[in-house]
Amino acid sequence: MDSNTAPLGPSCPQPPPAPQPQARSRLNATASLEQERSERPRAPGPQAGPGPGVRDAAAPAEPQAQHTRSRERADGTGPTKGDMEIPFEEVLERAKAGDPKAQTEVGKHYLQLAGDTDEELNSCTAVDWLVLAAKQGRREAVKLLRRCLADRRGITSENEREVRQLSSETDLERAVRKAALVMYWKLNPKKKKQVAVAELLENVGQVNEHDGGAQPGPVPKSLQKQRRMLERLVSSESKNYIALDDFVEITKKYAKGVIPSSLFLQDDEDDDELAGKSPEDLPLRLKVVKYPLHAIMEIKEYLIDMASRAGMHWLSTIIPTHHINALIFFFIVSNLTIDFFAFFIPLVIFYLSFISMVICTLKVFQDSKAWENFRTLTDLLLRFEPNLDVEQAEVNFGWNHLEPYAHFLLSVFFVIFSFPIASKDCIPCSELAVITGFFTVTSYLSLSTHAEPYTRRALATEVTAGLLSLLPSMPLNWPYLKVLGQTFITVPVGHLVVLNVSVPCLLYVYLLYLFFRMAQLRNFKGTYCYLVPYLVCFMWCELSVVILLESTGLGLLRASIGYFLFLFALPILVAGLALVGVLQFARWFTSLELTKIAVTVAVCSVPLLLRWWTKASFSVVGMVKSLTRSSMVKLILVWLTAIVLFCWFYVYRSEGMKVYNSTLTWQQYGALCGPRAWKETNMARTQILCSHLEGHRVTWTGRFKYVRVTDIDNSAESAINMLPFFIGDWMRCLYGEAYPACSPGNTSTAEEELCRLKLLAKHPCHIKKFDRYKFEITVGMPFSSGADGSRSREEDDVTKDIVLRASSEFKSVLLSLRQGSLIEFSTILEGRLGSKWPVFELKAISCLNCMAQLSPTRRHVKIEHDWRSTVHGAVKFAFDFFFFPFLSAA
């Protein structure tokens, strides 16, 4: 047998039979290896050394060996490079017993042998021994593995992945690996390769036992928390058996901040609180675990209930729910206006983003509980590995749990930009002020205690600055106290920003300094460990100050004290509130037509009721539970982003072209772009030249010639026409008006005109009040009065006429005009400038010579939103939200 032969690993080739002389240590190794091949002795534990099971995890030595290795590390004793008195056989036996230092020495020995002979075989064996040592957290073995990986020595397709994984481990992960090894063998005293989860749970109590055994007296609460945490850690895997590698991987995920969700599903005191409760009082997840038979019976009853409801499915096939849904949808969409969107969209954005803020804050509270459990597990690991870098572990945890904070800040962005635009009449500012104050306090209490001096001072500074800023708007007459909140000097900083010198400004500067100090902790790693979590408290506090400015004293009393007292007075107030509610509803119904309301509600509720019947699996409890999941927040943020981008594109399109208030007269336009210019050159050249006038807002005077209706839109009529004939006539009379009867008493011109159509109409009633009209007005140039009062032929040229498009809001004034009326109108030059009969949009109109009884004398102006000033106000509010009272937008 070859004297250089190593124990064969699964990926190593057979050694060549070429003996060579070696040193005395190698002869000792040869003898031990020959004995190993012939007898195959196994050391205590699941693994003896490299061989058929070389890829398995190595078991550590007995507890006495653990203390021996600790003393060797402390005293610097044990096998070293210069210590040649210890025979290699003894080192090999230690390596087989699981000593990581001996395994490293054996790996180094075979690396030296690989330099002389059988390089591939010895290198492969050395890597196998080094892998075993690296799995126990041996730093020297990791360095040698990195060198082997770089030189491709002993690296095969079977071990390359494992070598890369061990070589890339950080010091923190190696420390966690060491602690996990000790904990695993305490949980597995029989040194099995795989242990059942139930057996591990039975041995959890042994982890907290010291060398002298269990300590007398009650178990400290910290040890109880560590024991519960360890039980959750063991039961976090779905496997029935857990091996050493599985346990180590769980702890490595912990080191990276990826904590199993089962660790934080419930509080530490849940088991004590749920003791003695009946199955009906337990949550669903605990009911399934603790009382499975009772849960199965409930599921059976639920399935029977679903089966009974499924019989209603045939009803949905008879009633055309999709058609009804489509009719309602198109009726709603066709009646939507820009005014409605300008009112509704900011409210939707505000409420959705505020709900998203609340959900993200609840997720942050959940993470604060995770922080507490995280530190409990850290303390447990520190008992077995004092070299564990706790700060680095906390940094990893904080970095991997920044998602709810990012979602929260994005939600704050939407709240800030939508609040100044949204209608305050539809926002309960007093109630929201109380809610924001509550979340300010609770978010502060959930912060880490490591930065407590800075967070406490920051919150006190922020609250003081906010209260001082509120003093000038207080209704009380405290002139000396209000001076503290007033601005003494304003210094312009550029054209857009103003620097305010005041007491709140100085406090704000100090607050920024505290932010910097929090971020500076742990070499600026405190930015996402301490500063970002505190921003949740900061944003809630700033939002409460802003909403307080829109609140009233009575509303704050109602929101803070009234609702609290309402809980105690609930039995007495129920009857009174019910009576008041009935009276209010009766008053509301008497002011409206009850039949019309009932029919509308019934039609709209049919699809909803059928959908509820067919979707019996809908769970309100599940919906409430899902609010703490990030998927709901992501969905809200995606929709908010889409809505804001859509509105932004609309505003950008409508405000992109600046309107120029031109002094251009109609006569000048006619000379440049009228028939005279066409005759001098041609119409196409004239159109190209006149395109330079695009965007001019002009106010001209002209002669009204005629107006015509170009389009009539009635979505209600379209929807009713799709219904059966008798239902359609009934709904026309319900929602519309009946044709009047022709009688000598009809004095109204409109009634007289309608009564003539009664015999010709195919329905007894009409719903023309829902009509939306689009008009086109033809306007000619005004006549110039000559000396003899004659009009030139050129002035009455119809090719100089222009056409104005008008919406339904100009209906009243347009129907009162007569041919030849002198009108003043405003429009914007755009479109087919320089052609015959250019078409412009009517912006404003007034009649100059109409009789007062036919048309009001006021000017009819098209209602248009000033989107530019709206966006400017939102941006100014957002800037002041973040920087006031230090800076404010000009």
UniProtKB/Swiss-Prot annotation:
Disulfide bonds: none annotated. The chain crosses the membrane at residues 314-334, 340-360, 402-422, 427-447, 465-485, 496-516, 529-549, 563-583, 589-609, 632-652, 870-890. It is a multi-pass membrane protein. One of its GO terms (cellular component) is endoplasmic reticulum. The keyword Phosphoprotein applies. The modification Phosphoserine is found at S32, S157. One of its GO terms (molecular function) is ubiquitin protein ligase binding. Highly expressed in heart followed by brain, placenta, lung and pancreas. Weakly expressed in liver, kidney and skeletal muscle. Also expressed in islet and beta-cell insulinoma cell line. Residues 10-20 have a biased composition (Pro residues). Keywords: Acetylation, Cataract, Cytoplasmic vesicle, Deafness, Diabetes insipidus, Diabetes mellitus, Disease variant, Endoplasmic reticulum, Glycoprotein, Membrane, Non-syndromic deafness, Phosphoprotein, Transmembrane, Transmembrane helix. Residues 1-86 are annotated as: Disordered. One of its GO terms (biological process) is pancreas development. Pfam families: WC-rich, WCOB, WEF-hand, WSLR. The modification Phosphothreonine is found at T30. The modification N-acetylmethionine is found at M1. The keyword Cytoplasm does not apply. Residues 1-321 are annotated as: Interaction with ATP6V1A. Glycans are attached at N661, N746. It is linked to Wolfram syndrome 1: A rare disorder characterized by juvenile-onset insulin-dependent diabetes mellitus with optic atrophy. Other manifestations include diabetes insipidus, sensorineural deafness, dementia, psychiatric illnesses. Deafness, autosomal dominant, 6: A form of non-syndromic sensorineural hearing loss. Sensorineural deafness results from damage to the neural receptors of the inner ear, the nerve pathways to the brain, or the area of the brain that receives sound information. DFNA6 is a low-frequency hearing loss in which frequencies of 2000 Hz and below are predominantly affected. Many patients have tinnitus, but there are otherwise no associated features such as vertigo. Interacts with ATP6V1A. This is Wolframin.
